[in-house]
């Protein structure tokens, strides 16, 4: 208990006191994520919050972990955190092409699967499949990790959204690890909670700083590790969820996962690249209905809480029934949102005129040329 509490407190304190310093440095050096026609923010805001999240998380884990019982796989976890963070930070500052980001994510995933042994080895009866061969396990694990990394990256388009969803997901995973005395992963999960709680103080609308790709991809990576360890832990399965752990983990991450799967499916159906930017994400749909940043974040946070609660409520049902309920409720709500919820107010995009007397030109600093950005990152 002391170890877990220390993890939360240290991560919170380090992140909380680093953020004002990062905001000041960003302001002094004009390191901003500039608004454009697709982004939902209207003011210059730094996207370097991932630096504080990464520092608070990693230092917390290193300081409170018992190195006498330190899992060998954790050296690869720390290396993976560092690589995904640096990759995201480079993208936040200089912008990376999509293929370079995907290549980096594949490198991280290969390290976790081949070296750390982070594998889904059993589907617990999903589609009639139980044990997976090594090759099948590699494919399923790669898909899961890459999907979760990008799902958090792609929902990070509204102040407080990715942080609040990541917080509740890690809190749920951490609680069950703690209840089953899996302290290593409980510490990891609760350290994320501590860092995100501090970050949300500065990220809730109106945001003073964004987590950027360096933060959102790191949170996605953390959730992928926790989800796979949750699915693979025999104590959690036998004590709480029978054969339903994949559906439970899915329910804890349902909003980001189904959002990215739905949007990718829509793009493929329209014969577009899955990575082509659009405004079909849930936060875009809600904003198009006239909701503010805060209202969008609170709505989706409560939706994730509802799905987690529903999943736990029906945890003793068959795996397929739980998944069917999750999909049915989610897509029913999306349909109702699109077809029956009225628009509260019209959105008007003000575009600059060509005349010199028009709206004053927005400065574009060399380090952040928003118009030239080509990446998977969507707002």
Residue spans of the language-model regions?
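Membrane-embedded alpha-helical core segments of multi-pass
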Residues: 82-87, 104, 108-119, 140-150, ...
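Membrane interface segments of multi-pass transport proteins and intramembrane proteases
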Residues: 30-31, 92, 122-132, 292, ...
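Membrane-interfacial loop-to-helix junctions in multi-pass transporters
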Residues: 132-143, 186, 244
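Alpha-helical transmembrane segments
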Residues: 1-25, 29-30, 54-82, 162-289, ...
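Juxtamembrane helix-capping/reentrant segments at transmembrane boundaries
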Residues: 34-47
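A generic, lipid-embedded transmembrane alpha helix
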Residues: 46-62, 110-115
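Transmembrane alpha-helix boundary signature
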Residues: 59-72, 90-96, 113-127
